[in-house]
Amino acid sequence: MKFKSYFKSLQFSSKALLVLLQLVFIISTLSSCASDKNEERSHLVFRYNEHSNISSLDPAFARDQRNIWATNQLFNGLVQLDDALKIKPDIAKSWDIVDSTCTYYFTLRDDVYFHKNKAFGKDSTRKVTARDFEYSFNRLTDSKVASPGSWVMSNVELVKAENDSVLKILMKNSFPSFLGMLGMRYFSVVPKEAVDFYGNEFRRNPVGTGPFQFKLWEENVKLVFRKNKHYFETDTQGNRLPYLEAVAITFLPDKQSEFLQFTQGKIDFISGLDNSYKDEIITTTGQLQTKYKNSVTLSTTPFLNTEYLGFFMNTESQEIQSVALRQAINYGFDRNKMVKYLRNGMGIPAVNGFIPKGLPGFDAIEGYDYNPEKARELLAQYKTETGDNQPEISIGTNSQYLDICEYIQRELEKIGINVTIDVMPPSTLRQMKSGGELPIFRASWIADYPDAENYLSLFYSENFTPNGPNYTHYKNETFDSLYVVAQKISNIDDRKHLYTKMDSIVTAEAPVVPLFYDMAVRFVSKKVSGLGINPQNFLVLKKVKKEH
């Protein structure tokens, strides 16, 4: 009996084992199929990384690059800028400007719909009208919203929907740059129903009109957008955009880890140049290293970003108050060598004023080339005028630009200027810079819109911080009068002459030390096509394709 019982037990165990093996085989097969399916569809998903969390997907808060990149996939405005920064129609199919750039009439397309969402009730969506733009623009000025972009409406007197398809905008004063400004993400159209439905949570439940629509967001982990199958734009062959099925964003804070993900094919591109990997991927002359030439495309273009040191002019410091010493600092270091060795050639030495290359108003004005002899002469002049034989300055910066500040420190000490460097977190640097607490600060200015006026606004005396971007508190009556006149001139060539004069005034008085005009740099997987590059470093994914 015991033998029979044992035999039955063994027989049962064998059957159980067989069933178990079959289950394992089925599961592994299904898993393999799922993996194969994911692999087959991976070419339909564009993946990139952000180093810090996106704070909001509400375009009213599209203040910095990470928010702008994300919202650029979800929303549209009246106009858009192409890669050459030319103004093109977006939801507005045409426009008329009357009264010397004081009144605008925009005629809208009639085939644009908001993303499907429960906020619209049983219809799930509806057509965009001029009233939506009226609501969206006026929302920027609502103190309850507290949009950091409220300033873009400061010169707007009235926004009114004439009817469903015509929007009128009346300016307080002539402002020729306004049409280009409308390409900013702040000026996106949003539906009132969705803003009311989600309230403060609209920031993480965005509803727009863009080529992609919101799918899910696990903050600081991942963010996913899906294709908007009803998007209104088509390519030149009439194919509906976008080509991709989805966009996936990760949030790795470490740039070296991001680079590793890129080399492993887990993300599709990286933007910018970081010290942690720059020598690994490019040569000292700014070319791709040989090992990456078959898998990576390097794209560069002048970036509308000027990197600089700023002097806070409203101070009693005799070093800061001395034009001679400020000029000596400008002459006292070699920008060409700095860009070549610290940026691997990725940048343009800022020896021609503050306005960067690529903007109307940029001209090869005489700036500050490296001239240590001239710097010593100006330093001697400073000593004679002040009796101070040991000038000392302190530069506030964050760690990302420490190498550049240390280079300037070494070069200036060679000519007799003692330099200390105060390294602080980026948030502290921004706060102290805005509060006038730093005698000298490292900063950058990226164009909000493609007009040189945007850079010159940093020196207009009505724009002192915290009410504007004049962080240096520089004031010059001649500059101010030219700035006001330029706002009334619609012809860009006529404005350009005034811009050049203003840039020359700033250069001569040296409230800033321009370091370099930046380059937009992108390393893109060879599997990706259709990803352009532009001087504002916008991320436009609607025409991107990926190979298997």
Show which residues each predicted segment covers.
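N-terminal lobe/hinge region of extracytoplasmic solute-binding protein
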Residues: 49-99, 138, 207
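Alpha-helical secondary-structure segments
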Residues: 129-134, 210-211, 241-246, 264, ...
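Ligand-site clamp/hinge motif
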Residues: 200-203, 231-284, 418-420
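Extracytoplasmic/peripheral linker and loop segments enriched in polar/acidic and small residues
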Residues: 339, 420-429, 457-525, 548
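Surface-exposed binding/hinge segments that line
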Residues: 96, 132, 145-192, 213-218
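Ligand/substrate-recognition segments at binding pockets and active sites
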Residues: 348, 380-447, 520
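Gly/Pro-rich hinge or "lid" segments in bacterial periplasmic/extracellular proteins
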Residues: 175-242, 246, 256-257, 373-377
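Structural transition elements
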Residues: 212, 348-382, 401-403
